[in-house]
């Protein structure tokens, strides 16, 4: 799920991808996310590019920053803005496994 998250360094909510297991989403005090940036770089091993559109809720091509995985307090997640297609989730899963050496 693509969400808008309020961070400590900006007043404007930023997009992020929830990577935490659905089992823990309703009950845990924090949510594990990978931030999403529109500042795309050539790093296919740990940055997955998502397309803009109604499905993702993104206005421009953006990258999931697997290398910046973090847990944030549940109240920091402002709202859901979109969803990620299964093919992209598979790429993100592979990148997470690679980054975390799982």
Predicted segments with their positions:
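Conserved functional hotspots at enzyme active or ligand-binding sites that engage polyanionic ligands
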Residues: 1-102
């Amino acid at each position: 799920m693509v969400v808008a998250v309020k961070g400590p360094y900006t007043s404007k909510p930023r997009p992020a991808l929830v990577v935490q297991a659905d089992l823990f989403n309703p009950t845990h005090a924090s949510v594990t996310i990978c931030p999403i940036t529109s500042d795309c770089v050539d790093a296919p091993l740990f940055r997955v590019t998502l397309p803009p559109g109604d499905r993702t809720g993104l206005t421009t091509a953006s990258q999931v920053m697997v290398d910046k995985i973090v847990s944030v307090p549940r109240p920091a997640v402002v709202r859901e803005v979109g969803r990620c297609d299964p093919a992209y989730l598979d790429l993100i899963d592979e990148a997470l496994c690679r980054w975390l050496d799982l």
